């Protein structure tokens, strides 16, 4: 019985796609970053733009990545959460 149960678990893992994949970089980037998270986690892809001392002369700092939930917004930080591919393009310079 244990062998049958173990076999079913292995087959399920191999046959089902247990990950949700979002691409987090626009096509123009030379390397695309991809987040793989379990399908049961509500995945959010979020760019976070804010000013920092190191990057003040270069414009806004933008972080693209995955999070299980949309983070709490802090003053001076712009957060955009989404759950589809390429929904958070890198902002264009103005």
From Swiss-Prot:
The keyword Secreted applies. GO terms for cellular component: extracellular region. It comes from the Eukaryota. Keywords: Acetylcholine receptor inhibiting toxin, Disulfide bond, Ion channel impairing toxin, Neurotoxin, Postsynaptic neurotoxin, Secreted, Signal, Toxin. InterPro entries: Snake_3FTx, Snake_toxin-like_sf, Snake_toxin_con_site, Toxin_cobra-type. Residues 1-19 form the signal peptide. Pfam families: Toxin_cobra-type. CDD domains: TFP_snake_toxin. GO terms for molecular function: acetylcholine receptor inhibitor activity; ion channel regulator activity; toxin activity. Gene3D superfamilies: CD59. Disulfide bonds join 35-55, 37-66, 70-81, 82-87. Expressed by the venom gland. It is found in: Secreted. Has the length of long neurotoxins, but only 4 disulfide bonds, as short neurotoxins. In addition, the position of cysteine residues is not conserved. Belongs to the three-finger toxin family. Long-chain subfamily. Type II alpha-neurotoxin sub-subfamily. Binds with high affinity to muscular nicotinic acetylcholine receptors (nAChRs), whereas it binds with a low affinity to neuronal alpha-7/CHRNA7 nAChRs. This is Long neurotoxin-like OH-31.
